[in-house]
Amino acid sequence: MKTTGWRSLILYIIGAGFLVGIIFFICSYFIQGGSWAIRPSNAHITNNGQLTYSGEITDRDSNLLSYSKDGVQQYNDNALIRKATLHVVGDPNGYISTGAQYAFRTQLSGFNPITGVVSPFGSSVTGSNIKLTISSDVSAAALQALNGKKGAVAVYNYKTGEVLCMVSSPTFDPLNIPSDIETNSAYEGVYLNNALSSTYTPGSIFKVITAAAAIENIPDLDSRTFHCSGSTIINGEKITCDSVHGDISFQNGLAQSCNVVFAELAVELGKDTMTKYADQLGCNTNFYLDG
């Protein structure tokens, strides 16, 4: 009887382990099945890292930006729009990892946990469509405004979370990839979205943080008069201003973006106070975009 009891216990343990494994697999399949389906090893779904068939990517006005058919990535008919939306949409070779083609590849594949990438009638699905919040027209205007300069233009609606425009330069036409893109220094960093993956000195926009800290920590700020001679010396370093403002109040210093006023205020406030307000306003934290 003891032998039978031990055998039963072992069988129960094996059965319970098997059941737990089945439950774990089913849960993993429903959660990660889409990611499994679009792995490069699934040659009938992907081709050179890109989806063989994918749904359409459109802008906020339903203008077509991209789709895939027979393993070939298709784009908007307008070359300027193709260049302006390249880093948001993605490139034909999948080198731009922050584009919608990569970020939403599971949705674009049309994967369904029940039928996979095949319809109930046995035919291959063409993928699911997604609509982005960007405007292709605004993006085109932003790229023209950059006028070939390296940088980025982003427009973000803080009330709704919508990204209306995210343009990065340098860029290229995904339907006419330059033959010297790998050797020409003009295309250095072209696969990076400068709005997301590059770092820049904040410049005058940081004066808003300095102003907020000064307003709350310097009681006589409104009655003070600063003097701008076009430059000032801070810790042995010369800080220059674009203009010679002369005697100037804090309010006018903010309106005129006077470097002398805000350099002196930053020194007076000190490192700890400036860091505190920078943290409170989110300058030292990451944030995520989904649009």
Explain the meaning of each model-derived region.
Residues 61, 159-203, 209-291:
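Beta-lactam-recognizing serine transpeptidase/beta-lactamase-like catalytic domain environment
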Residues 1-181, 190, 199, 272-280:
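Periplasmic/cell-envelope proteins involved in peptidoglycan metabolism and beta-lactam response
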